[in-house]
Design a protein with these regions (language model features):
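Acidic, His- and aromatic-enriched active-site or binding-groove loops in soluble protein domains
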Residues: 61-68, 174-197
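TRNA-binding/sensing appendages of the translation machinery
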Residues: 1-82, 138
């Protein structure tokens, strides 16, 4: 008899579980070596508390909601950054920064599972609280690359962008306020066909529309930062400063990705994603969220990242198959 499980979820059997355990222990070892203490938060949070994060991005993953016996509205956490922001404000109100936390936890998102998106995700990551840019961002990228190296992943690259870049360009060419959210939503999905359509609908002059379509498609070394217009100056300077602080073995993993827009609405500056040729989707990502802690009563700059353990496992298996077939990086 077949007893189904909800779409977007899966069982993990012993052989795969052993492999995933090796991955998570490798990640934990690097996090611990860099001074990140592991925390765990409830899977259930009060909706009213997490609403302080003011996540209004149209591409924000939807959450599961339910009522408890007293009628209070609860949500299943969709990531760990917002719960850790709550922890910092409530449990570490006077602790001097920087504060370093890591985690291994399940998160839940009320997505349309028929699109292949998981409803339950196992994530590992860090949050660095109280360390401003560019130094804090460089530390997070360093820990990220060393953690991936520890798992044995070889072919990955880290795309580095800035959440303020595209909004600054839109403001610079005076995109109508009512059109900006639609453009950002298309860019977050990497849907350049939809981006081009939305730019046409916004009624921009051809040159300005071409600028907003071409800049997000720039990806590569420092040369892609050249020739950007004045409104992009702050974002470009920030990305350059972060890159200059990286050790050579980390810097060689980083590429500039000017179309990078993370779907979570709290990012304010540098953002990054992990790519690997063995997987057709990002393995993980993160960025700066310098305004989030202030919404919980403790204004501190912050940066962090999360890695999807399932996707990391698939990428490692794909690289192993590639080596077995005689493929090289």
């Amino acid at each position: 008899m077949i007893h189904p499980i909800p779409s977007g979820t899966r069982d993990v059997l012993p052989d795969e579980m052993r492999e995933m355990r090796l991955i998570t222990e490798a990640l934990r070892g690097v996090f611990d070596a860099h001074g990140y203490g592991e925390v765990y938060t409830p899977a259930l949070e009060y909706e009213a508390v997490l609403a302080r994060a003011e996540l209004t991005s149209p591409s924000q993953p939807p959450v599961y909601r339910m009522f408890d016996e007293s009628g209070a509205l609860l949500v299943l956490r969709s990531d760990m950054t917002v719960p850790i922001a709550r922890v910092v404000a409530t449990r570490y109100p006077q602790s001097p920064p920087p504060l370093r936390f890591c985690y291994l936890a399940h998160c839940y998102r009320a997505v349309r599972a028929q699109r292949g998106q998981p409803r339950e995700l196992l994530q590992a990551g860090i949050e660095l609280i109280g360390s401003p840019a560019p130094e804090g961002t460089a530390e997070a990228l360093t820990v990220l690359c060393r953690a991936l190296d520890a798992t044995g992943l070889e072919g990955y690259r880290v795309g580095l962008g800035d959440a303020s870049l595209f909004p600054a360009l839109m403001a610079g060419v005076e995109v109508p306020e009512g059109a900006r959210a639609e453009l950002l939503e298309a860019l977050a999905r990497r849907d350049f066909v939809e981006l081009e359509r939305a730019l046409g609908a916004a009624g921009l002059p051809a040159g300005e529309a071409e600028l907003l379509l071409s800049v997000p498609q720039r990806r590569g070394g420092p040369e892609v930062l050249a020739g950007l217009p004045g409104p992009a100056a702050d974002a470009v300077a920030g990305m350059r400063m972060v890159h200059e602080l990286l050790e050579p073995e980390v810097a060689e993993r980083v590429i500039f990705d000017l179309g990078l827009v993370r779907s979570l609405g709290y990012y304010t500056g540098a953002v990054f994603e992990v790519y690997d040729p063995a997987l057709g989707a990002p393995i993980g990502g993160g960025g700066r969220y310098d305004e989030l802690l202030g919404r919980f009563g403790r204004p501190l700059p912050a940066v962090g990242f999360a890695l999807g353990i399932d996707r990391l496992h698939i990428a490692l298996a794909g690289e192993e198959r590639g080596r077995g077939a005689g493929l090289t990086r």
